[in-house]
Amino acid sequence: MVSNKNDKKKLGKGTTAVHSGTSSSENSLNTPVYQTSTFYLDDNAYEMWMNGVPRAPVYSGRYFNPTNRAVEKKIADLEGAEDALVFSSGMAAICTSLLNFLGQGDRIVTTRNLYGGTVLSLDQDFTRFGIDVHYVDIKDLDAVEKALKEKKTNVLYCETVTNPLLEVS
């Protein structure tokens, strides 16, 4: 793949989708699929991991996999972003994103017209973490505005098109 950032901008979406994420050190024309769960961790990688270095080298498929990393690089290149992160499920993506912005004492304004697993997590887990979950009819803009003004809100969250009702929020 092209290593110069300016050259990457010249590539079409199709070329980017096919070739991003592959490592020139592997000399592979296709993105490899790694079907292993454990990777060798050398002394340098171990030290990086122990020091909390983000994106430290691979050691377990539970935390990192070269196949996933290739997909992340492809998505980032296609979106013109610095980086990307993939998850094994929608709930993992939703919870990670929300918990990145919310902590004990924070507030989220949302709607009950969400995927059932999201509502369950908000009602059981987020409240247990001390996060104030406030539900409104997301289509009632006056109710949304009132909820946002009555107390400091850290996140306004809705899904569109909703699952499973396919409503536009």
Report each predicted region and the residues it spans.
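Buried hydrophobic positions in well-ordered alpha/beta secondary-structure cores of metabolic enzymes
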Residues: 27, 75, 93, 108, ...
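Short, surface-exposed connector motifs at secondary-structure boundaries
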Residues: 78-81, 102-107, 127, 152-156
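Well-ordered alpha/beta subsegment
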Residues: 80-81, 92, 107, 141-145
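N-terminal "arm"/small-domain region of PLP-dependent enzymes with the aminotransferase-like
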Residues: 2-65, 73
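Conserved N-terminal alpha-helix of the aminotransferase class I/II PLP-enzyme fold
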Residues: 43-92, 117-126
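PLP-dependent aminotransferase-class I/II
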Residues: 120-169
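Conserved PLP-anchoring active-site segment centered on the Schiff-base-forming lysine
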Residues: 100-117, 136
